[in-house]
């Protein structure tokens, strides 16, 4: 079971907690046992500040992942880490890319959760593995391939 701590520090419209929970559970189902993670929904000001502080990028990005660095033996439930999602950026990207908000939110939550599990996309082989898993999980939800050649740019971690 995933214990989700949802923090809403945004005035924008966000998905229902049940949807966020469902997307996290889907992305994290390969992990056995209970886990805890936090999703913090922010506006552009906080998103920009966090991106500047942690990545030295002076703009708000869609999702930031902060894997926990606490040994499991010190916790009642293993802590996976935190996701920070900038609500206005998600809304803007979905509109610019011609995606439904639901599909884009699902993609970003899954993408962030996979980062918490250690997946990355710095090297081409790692990117292919991570994107293939994202495609599979999104297809299970009935969402289209966000990386399809005929779809608009995804905007996912375009600056990494």
From Swiss-Prot:
<dbReference type="GO" id="GO:0005737">
    <property type="term" value="C:cytoplasm"/>
</dbReference>
<dbReference type="InterPro" id="IPR002036">
    <property type="entry name" value="YbeY"/>
</dbReference>
<dbReference type="Pfam" id="PF02130">
    <property type="entry name" value="YbeY"/>
</dbReference>
<comment type="similarity">
    <text>Belongs to the endoribonuclease YbeY family.</text>
</comment>
<feature type="binding site">
    <location>
        <position position="121"/>
    </location>
    <ligand>
        <name>Zn(2+)</name>
    </ligand>
</feature>
<feature type="binding site">
    <location>
        <position position="115"/>
    </location>
    <ligand>
        <name>Zn(2+)</name>
    </ligand>
</feature>
<dbReference type="GO" id="GO:0008270">
    <property type="term" value="F:zinc ion binding"/>
</dbReference>
<dbReference type="GO" id="GO:0004222">
    <property type="term" value="F:metalloendopeptidase activity"/>
</dbReference>
<protein>
    <recommendedName>
        <fullName>Endoribonuclease YbeY</fullName>
        <ecNumber>3.1.-.-</ecNumber>
    </recommendedName>
</protein>
<keyword id="KW-0378">Hydrolase</keyword>
<keyword id="KW-0540">Nuclease</keyword>
<keyword id="KW-0690">Ribosome biogenesis</keyword>
<dbReference type="GO" id="GO:0006364">
    <property type="term" value="P:rRNA processing"/>
</dbReference>
<keyword id="KW-0255">Endonuclease</keyword>
<dbReference type="GO" id="GO:0004521">
    <property type="term" value="F:RNA endonuclease activity"/>
</dbReference>
<keyword id="KW-0698">rRNA processing</keyword>
<keyword id="KW-0479">Metal-binding</keyword>
<dbReference type="InterPro" id="IPR020549">
    <property type="entry name" value="YbeY_CS"/>
</dbReference>
<feature type="binding site">
    <location>
        <position position="111"/>
    </location>
    <ligand>
        <name>Zn(2+)</name>
    </ligand>
</feature>
<keyword id="KW-0963">Cytoplasm</keyword>
<dbReference type="InterPro" id="IPR023091">
    <property type="entry name" value="MetalPrtase_cat_dom_sf_prd"/>
</dbReference>
<comment type="function">
    <text>Single strand-specific metallo-endoribonuclease involved in late-stage 70S ribosome quality control and in maturation of the 3' terminus of the 16S rRNA.</text>
</comment>
<keyword id="KW-0862">Zinc</keyword>
């Amino acid at each position: 079971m995933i214990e989700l701590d949802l923090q809403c520090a945004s005035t924008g419209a966000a998905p229902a907690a049940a949807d966020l929970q469902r997307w996290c559970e889907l992305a994290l189902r390969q992990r056995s046992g209970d886990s805890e993670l936090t999703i913090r929904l922010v506006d552009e000001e906080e998103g920009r500040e966090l991106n500047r502080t942690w990545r030295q990028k002076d703009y708000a990005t869609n999702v930031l992942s902060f894997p926990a660095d606490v040994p499991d033996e010190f916790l009642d439930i293993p802590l996976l880490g935190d996701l920070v999602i900038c609500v206005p950026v998600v809304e803007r990207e979905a509109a610019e890319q011609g995606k439904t908000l639901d599909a884009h939110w699902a993609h970003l939550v899954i993408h962030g959760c996979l980062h918490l599990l250690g997946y990355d996309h710095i090297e081409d082989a790692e990117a292919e593995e991570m994107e293939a898993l994202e495609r599979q999980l999104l297809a299970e939800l009935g969402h289209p391939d966000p990386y399809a050649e005929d779809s608009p740019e995804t905007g996912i971690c375009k600056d990494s």
